[in-house]
Amino acid sequence: MPVGGGSNLIVSDRPRTVAVSTSAFDLVEANGRKIYAGAGARLSKIMRTAEKNGLSGVEFWAGIPATFGGAVKMNAGAFSSETMDKVLYIDVLTGGKVKRLWKSGINYGYRHTETDGIILGGAIALEPSSPDAVRQKTREYLEKRRQTQPAGKSAGSVFKKVGGVGAGKYLDLAGLKGKRFGGAVVSEKHAGFFLNDGGATFEDFRRLADYAADKVWQKFGVKLEKEVVYFE
């Protein structure tokens, strides 16, 4: 299984799956209004390239500790923007050959992108701006994250939105803030995030997620779908 930065993965204490890192594919090149990035390029690196070249459009990535390949696969997003909004095409390895997939031919949606093969890289289209303006917008997004999201160890949002409503709202209303199993605990700051406050195991996290989803179902009749990926 190919993995990027692992920021949305919950890894088993005894995984049976072999992980293949894409970190070597970290090329980032700007060409006019476009930037090509390898699957292993950190979003922060792409953002620095965009800022340097006065290109705006991916400031919403600020604070997301992911690689480009992972962001494409999960269609990572924030602040009403998503990665696939900016993608022109992606290059994938399939059947031993490299194939270019243009966005018009890719099936994608909220927090998922279907790809026939392993993502190697891709191009994004941005808008002309200035380095100062891009830098300021990035700072604003970072500040919003600091104000609303916990700073502890987490894998990001555990569950996807439901009908445009953040799962954290349901978890909060279900009284789950502070609920824990072992070292895994629901954040007091934002119930959509589960924290590892020291020594949390894979089973701690899974039990907490299952418990939380069950409570929301019982109270609201709402079925939560995981945004994190279990790696077993």
Task: Give names to the regions the model predicted.
Residues G57-L88, S154:
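A gly/ser-rich beta-alpha-beta helix-loop segment of oxidoreductase catalytic cores
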Residues A50, F68, V72-A76, D91-T94, ...:
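Short, well-ordered alpha-helical segments in soluble proteins
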Residues P2, T83-D85, K179:
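Short solvent-exposed loop/turn micro-motifs enriched in small/polar/acidic residues
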Residues L9-V11, K45, F68-N75, E82, ...:
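Basic, gly/Ser/Thr/Pro-rich low-complexity segments located predominantly at protein N termini
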